[in-house]
Amino acid sequence: MKLRDSLAENNSIRLQAEANTWQEAVKIGVDLLVAADVVEPRYYQAILDGVEQFGPYFVIAPGLVMPHGRPEEGVKKTGFSLVTLKKPLEFNHEDNDPVDILITMAAVDANTHQEVGIMQIVNLFEDEANFDRLRACRTAQEVLDLIDRTNAAA
């Protein structure tokens, strides 16, 4: 499942969302996947449990997090949600706080997680200007167009 296709088919883009805590921000992303029948509601708690156990493991770049759990923690099918925050939040990461872009990922197996999910996110943000381009998006279509332009250039 490609990032762009998942976001479009699952209607799982939320821009300029408001959240007061990192937990609320993560819940917005997971709730989009629950609504699209990609994950079970328990996926949210699994992500929180992972942070409790391993720390903020999904803070992957300045301003960017990729919340995700394990396939057996409620994943029904592979999918993504994308959330931008109106106000950046602290995720307790020494180097990459504050965060205002969340790409929540659900993968049916570890191979999909590594090869499909992470590589597509890396591709999108290989051009660092895409961080600001994404922050400037105000409609889901603008996000999809940005991903299309990035994929065309790759």
Curated annotation (Swiss-Prot):
PTS EIIA type-2 domain sequence ranges: 6-150
Phosphohistidine: modified positions: H68
GO molecular function: kinase activity
Stimuli inducing this protein: Induced by L-ascorbate. Repressed by UlaR.
This protein's UniProt keywords: Cytoplasm, Kinase, Phosphoprotein, Phosphotransferase system, Transferase, Transport
Active site: H68
Pfam families on file: PTS_EIIA_2
Subcellular locations according to the entry: Cytoplasm
Assigned GO CC terms: cytoplasm
Function: The phosphoenolpyruvate-dependent sugar phosphotransferase system (sugar PTS), a major carbohydrate active transport system, catalyzes the phosphorylation of incoming sugar substrates concomitantly with their translocation across the cell membrane. The enzyme II UlaABC PTS system is involved in ascorbate transport.
Domain notes: The PTS EIIA type-2 domain is phosphorylated by phospho-HPr on a histidyl residue. Then, it transfers the phosphoryl group to the PTS EIIB type-2 domain.
Identification of the protein by name: Ascorbate-specific PTS system EIIA component
Organism field: Salmonella typhi
